[in-house]
């Protein structure tokens, strides 16, 4: 094969000019036309018996194009191997204006290469290691949340209070005129749960079933409904029903409802503690991992290949559309999401992928079979039948990709924590879990 010069363009972009001998193009085209001749069914001729000259007239141009495309791909692969080029993404091929050699046809291949990844001094990086604990107080708090999730509402004949569920009819008007979304019949909500604007809820508090009143509500300037933002509305509200909240007692029935067959409350609390501890551990590990990944991005000067960033952005866009479809938005698959809105996230992911690959290779951080099994077991632990989940993962090798990736990330986190300056940060239960009430 003739020597080929690799021209450096901007950043990671490279260019090579591929030369395809016309003799090879013509020979391959003739071969393809003969194959077409054997399959061709043309009026006036028996199948496969049409003259080759006629086949060439009918299919010659498309056959030659196919051959050139095939040869270009093959020649580019050969050049990449010979020149030890680490090609990122797919090349684009362009015609060359100066076809000065009558013996060959020239095509330019423009492509990107993977950047050289050099891991900087990790000891100079600061990493935040997040910690949190789960004790009796956190179990009590979680049990209270579980009680609230099982709230029952019972009809009462009294004025409405915060915490009650009310059913109302309402009609709102701005400057005496009704507006879109401003009216409803038998609308149910819980007072004090911030489901409605504060002035609206305050107007309902103290009302009894059967009463009606007008309530003035000022919509905030940043209200999500742009047509009413910053405006004042008068709502005519009729209260139809008041129901008082009743929380279940923490007893055997409550424990059974949470899956404790014998209703033992102590066992229930242990199960709650185990589940909450697992979730807290997952969340603090995620925060620590995020800090480690940020440190790696600081430690490595890296320009991610544009082709890979674009591919990842497209993947993220498709993922978002699929999520919309899964949520019931049937036409979401046709949404035209601009890729620019995903570029920053895509660039981060591609960069981290390159850095982690280098780090794992240099420091032998590939996970062991036992580590992957541990990740799968952790996944399965929260399900009713853990063994069924484990069997599902191991029934198809491709399903182990996610657990393997998590095991790799865990090894990377441990490695970086062993090298960097680690600052421990203890978080409260509420800080880890977010506001839950």
Swiss-Prot record:
Pfam families: FKBP_C, Trigger_C, Trigger_N. Keywords: Cell cycle, Cell division, Chaperone, Cytoplasm, Isomerase, Rotamase. The keyword Isomerase applies. PROSITE patterns: FKBP_PPIASE. It is found in: Cytoplasm. GO terms for cellular component: cytoplasm. Its main location: cytoplasm. It catalyses: [protein]-peptidylproline (omega=180) = [protein]-peptidylproline (omega=0). InterPro entries: PPIase_dom_sf (IPR046357), PPIase_FKBP_dom (IPR001179), Trig_fac (IPR005215), Trigger_fac_C (IPR008880), Trigger_fac_C_sf (IPR037041), Trigger_fac_ribosome-bd_bac (IPR008881), Trigger_fac_ribosome-bd_sf (IPR036611), Trigger_fact/SurA_dom_sf (IPR027304). GO terms for molecular function: peptidyl-prolyl cis-trans isomerase activity; protein folding chaperone; ribosome binding. Its EC number is 5.2.1.8. Involved in protein export. Acts as a chaperone by maintaining the newly synthesized protein in an open conformation. Functions as a peptidyl-prolyl cis-trans isomerase. Belongs to the FKBP-type PPIase family. Tig subfamily. PANTHER family: TRIGGER FACTOR CHAPERONE AND PEPTIDYL-PROLYL CIS/TRANS ISOMERASE, TRIGGER FACTOR-LIKE PROTEIN TIG, CHLOROPLASTIC. This is Trigger factor. It comes from Neisseria meningitidis serogroup A / serotype 4A (strain DSM 15465 / Z2491).
């Amino acid at each position: 094969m003739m020597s080929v010069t690799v021209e450096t363009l901007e950043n990671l972009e490279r260019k090579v000019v591929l030369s395809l001998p016309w003799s090879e193009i013509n020979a391959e085209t003739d071969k393809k036309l003969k194959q077409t001749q054997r399959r061709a069914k043309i009026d006036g001729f028996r199948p496969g018996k049409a003259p080759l000259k006629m086949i060439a007239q009918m299919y010659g141009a498309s056959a030659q194009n196919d051959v050139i495309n095939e040869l270009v791909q093959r020649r580019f692969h050969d050049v990449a191997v010979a020149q030890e080029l680490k090609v990122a993404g797919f090349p684009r091929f362009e015609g060359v204006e100066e076809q000065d050699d009558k013996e060959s046809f020239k095509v330019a291949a423009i492509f990107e290469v993977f950047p050289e990844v050099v891991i900087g001094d990790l000891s100079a990086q600061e990493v935040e290691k997040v910690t949190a604990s789960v004790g009796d107080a956190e179990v009590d708090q979680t049990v209270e949340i579980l009680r609230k999730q099982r709230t029952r509402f019972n009809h009462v004949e009294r004025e409405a209070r915060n915490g009650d569920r009310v059913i109302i009819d309402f009609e709102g008007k701005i400057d005496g005129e009704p507006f879109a979304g401003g009216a409803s019949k038998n609308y149910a909500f819980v007072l004090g749960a911030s489901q409605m604007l504060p002035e609206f809820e305050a107007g309902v508090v103290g009302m009894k079933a059967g009463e009606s009143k007008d309530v003035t509500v000022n919509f905030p300037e940043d209200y999500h409904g742009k047509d009413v933002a910053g405006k004042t509305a008068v709502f005519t509200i009729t209260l139809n029903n008041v129901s008082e909240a009743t929380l279940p007692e923490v007893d055997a029935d409550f424990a059974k409802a949470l899956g404790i067959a014998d209703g033992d409350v102590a066992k229930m609390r242990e199960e709650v503690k185990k589940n909450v501890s697992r979730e807290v551990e997952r969340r603090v590990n995620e925060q620590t991992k995020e800090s480690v990944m940020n440190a790696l991005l600081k430690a490595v000067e890296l320009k991610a290949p544009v082709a890979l960033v674009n591919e990842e952005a497209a993947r993220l866009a498709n993922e978002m559309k699929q999520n919309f479809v899964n949520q019931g938005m049937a036409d979401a698959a046709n949404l035209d999401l601009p890729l620019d809105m995903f570029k920053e996230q895509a660039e981060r992911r591609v960069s981290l992928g390159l850095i982690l690959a280098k780090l794992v290779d240099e420091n032998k951080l590939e996970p062991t079979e036992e580590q992957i099994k541990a990740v799968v077991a952790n996944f399965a632990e929260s399900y009713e039948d853990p063994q069924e989940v484990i069997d599902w993962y191991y029934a198809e090798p491709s399903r182990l990709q996610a657990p393997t990736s998590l095991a790799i990330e865990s090894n990377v986190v441990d490695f970086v924590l062993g090298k960097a300056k680690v600052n421990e940060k203890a978080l409260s239960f509420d800080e880890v879990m977010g506001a839950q009430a």
